Amino acid sequence: LESNSKNKAIANILSFYLETNLHNRLNQDLDSLKARLFEAEQALDTDSKLAKSMASAKNVVLSMPFVLGVPRGNPDEALPNYVLKNALTTILDRVQAQSQGLYPITTVAAIPPIEQLGPLASSIGHLNVIPDIDGAIRSEALVLKHYDRFYPSIALQIAARSLNLENADIKVNLAESVELGSLQIKTDDQLMMNTFFYSNIGDFPAFQVDSFYDVFSGKIPLDKY
């Protein structure tokens, strides 16, 4: 290579190569790059940020989808303890439901929240939707049966927390109902609760739908809820 090369790119490479403090500059640049990478890792670690906010709030309810199906043996692996503690323990059979095989819808697997977030949740509930044969959704599975345990839906968990109730306060009457304190929710024999149709009130829907962005940006105050 000649220093008077007419190719500007080659000339720049030559100048860079001949520089006496080349390695010193490289080390400095690499150190700077490490710092930038560390900052990027911190900025992109959204799980840690979410975990921190959940630990501060102490009232976050997480969802957990189950895989529906009929168990033929034992589960492949046990669910983590932060999921197990959400299993319902007050299960009553007043109508001989078990002898008739009347149980909630069964599952064969679950996808729990990640370990970084699960232990920080106020509670965890299933997020499964059970459509009718025509695809319409007319009912809510308040409880699912996962092998020998019963897990509430996220809707049931939220309702319980809004009443200042814990999982131990949720009572399941097989093939009959679910009780939240003094509130009794009638169900079918699979603990499915029928959802109701609410017609519009004049020109307005029965339930107003707000934009998440409007709430998040402060356009709609949180006090509304």
Model-derived features with residue positions:
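Membrane-proximal, cysteine-centered motifs at transmembrane boundaries in secretory-pathway
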Residues: 146, 186-225
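Non-transmembrane functional regions of envelope-associated proteins
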Residues: 1-188, 224-225
